Amino acid sequence: MSGRPRTTSFAESCKPVQQPSAFGSMKVSRDKDGSKVTTVVATPGQGPDRPQEVSYTDTKVIGNGSFGVVYQAKLCDSGELVAIKKVLQDKRFKNRELQIMRKLDHCNIVRLRYFFYSSGEKKDEVYLNLVLDYVPETVYRVARHYSRAKQTLPVIYVKLYMYQLFRSLAYIHSFGICHRDIKPQNLLLDPDTAVLKLCDFGSAKQLVRGEPNVSYICSRYYRAPELIFGATDYTSSIDMWSAGCVLAELLLGQPIFPGDSGVDQLVEIIKVLGTPTREQIREMNPNYTEFKFPQIKAHPWTKVFRPRTPPEAIALCSRLLEYTPTARLTPLEACAHSFFDELRDPNVKLPNGRDTPALFNFTTQELSSNPPLATILIPPHARIQAAASPPANATAASDTNAGDRGQTNNAASASASNST
């Protein structure tokens, strides 16, 4: 979690929020079974701002924290379950999470279906409500289940979950957006299909070179060392460090760097990676001069993990958990790593016998950071399948165009970004 209260994301613009004309209109009625039905005027998450009535029922609290409250509800028109994230809105500012989520459209990112505003109990209190895809599980809960049973998560699931996480990061990083809170709790899972969706963009920000950012960001176990060193000019590579921590945790069955404090977090990292060199410290934060840790040698990666851990998994981990931010793999490079070769096998299936989820429907936007990697990322059987399915290609093209529009909007909003 970030150091600031996450009741709302701070502004990318200091102009007052333009509330919808139907702001605050919330009708409560009963259906034929006597269940409470709430009807609001909501704006679709994507596309033009055309407010419409949305009715939902069966509301119950499924989570809360410093950010606000999350409810589960059922849409009356489709019967689909959704999650409604309710956060206190500072009327002086636009909500950064909302601005970012409206630009995103990817199979591995939780979708913003609608958003609406509602009144609070106090005078002038305004809440923003984000209506999102409901996904029943998280990587955190699934991993905890295996850990409590004294078992390790099957490697095929480690591959599927991490690959989809890297795809989601390749997508948001292509827009210059850094998530800044990658952790197992923010990776939603459908256990039947093995589809993973990245959620919680409450800490996310479009990073602009030369503009400072807060260093007290990201949950402790997953914080990149440059953040611990107080860097304010970090890049999206902090997400890749966090992803490396998630990968290591899935292989180990417990967090790899379980620090009790910021300094202790660094100690845990040094126990594995060894003491960083002066050059590595300079790469993390040129202004940091107070480094006085004892000289400790790096622990061999093969001894960090269990004896039967796949060598490719260890190799991938070592390329993510690097002190030097620029030495870490990019998300696309991670997807192309040999650890994921099994997923590119045309005969691979889920342990329950089902087909694997969509893994190769890359758009131009996703591949923009390194187009030549497409030769590895899209295996021959997927190319043949795509060529035989024009509607799928049309969807991909549509997604790409939507991504291009989002990139333009991002560039426009970046200049108004603040320094949190």
UniProtKB/Swiss-Prot annotation:
A single MF term (Gene Ontology): scaffold protein binding
This protein's record includes keyword Electron transport: no
Q: Which residues carry this modification: Phosphoserine?
A: S9, S389
The protein's annotated catalytic reaction(s) are:
L-seryl-[tau protein] + ATP = O-phospho-L-seryl-[tau protein] + ADP + H(+); L-threonyl-[tau protein] + ATP = O-phospho-L-threonyl-[tau protein] + ADP + H(+); L-seryl-[protein] + ATP = O-phospho-L-seryl-[protein] + ADP + H(+); L-threonyl-[protein] + ATP = O-phospho-L-threonyl-[protein] + ADP + H(+)
Location in the cell reads: Cytoplasm; Nucleus; Membrane; Cell membrane
Its Gene Ontology cellular component terms are: axon; beta-catenin destruction complex; centrosome; cytoplasm; cytosol; dendrite; dendritic shaft; dendritic spine
- Residues annotated for ATP binding in this entry: I62, G63, N64, G65, S66, F67, G68, V69, V70, K85
Q: How is its activity regulated?
A: Activated by phosphorylation at Tyr-216. In response to insulin, inhibited by phosphorylation at Ser-9 by PKB/AKT1; phosphorylation at this site causes a conformational change, preventing access of substrates to the active site. Inhibited by IL22 treatment which also triggers phosphorylation at Ser-9, promoting inactivation. Inhibited by lithium.
Instruction: State the post-translational modifications.
Output: Phosphorylated by AKT1 and ILK1. Upon insulin-mediated signaling, the activated PKB/AKT1 and RPS6KA3 protein kinases phosphorylate and deactivate GSK3B, resulting in the dephosphorylation and activation of GYS1. Activated by phosphorylation at Tyr-216. Inactivated by phosphorylation at Ser-9. Phosphorylated in a circadian manner in the hippocampus. Mono-ADP-ribosylation by PARP10 negatively regulates kinase activity.
What's a GO biological-process term for it? negative regulation of insulin receptor signaling pathway
EC number(s) for this protein?
A: 2.7.11.26, 2.7.11.1
Please list the residues that make up the active site: D181 (proton acceptor)
Which region ranges are annotated with the description Disordered?
A: 1-53, 385-420
Q: Which species is this record about?
A: Rattus norvegicus (Rat)
Gene assigned in the entry = Gsk3b
- This protein is called Glycogen synthase kinase-3 beta
Keywords for the protein's UniProt record, in alphabetical order: ADP-ribosylation, ATP-binding, Biological rhythms, Carbohydrate metabolism, Cell membrane, Cytoplasm, Developmental protein, Differentiation, Glycogen metabolism, Kinase, Lipoprotein, Membrane, Neurogenesis, Nucleotide-binding, Nucleus, Palmitate, Phosphoprotein, Serine/threonine-protein kinase, Signal transduction inhibitor, Transferase, Wnt signaling pathway
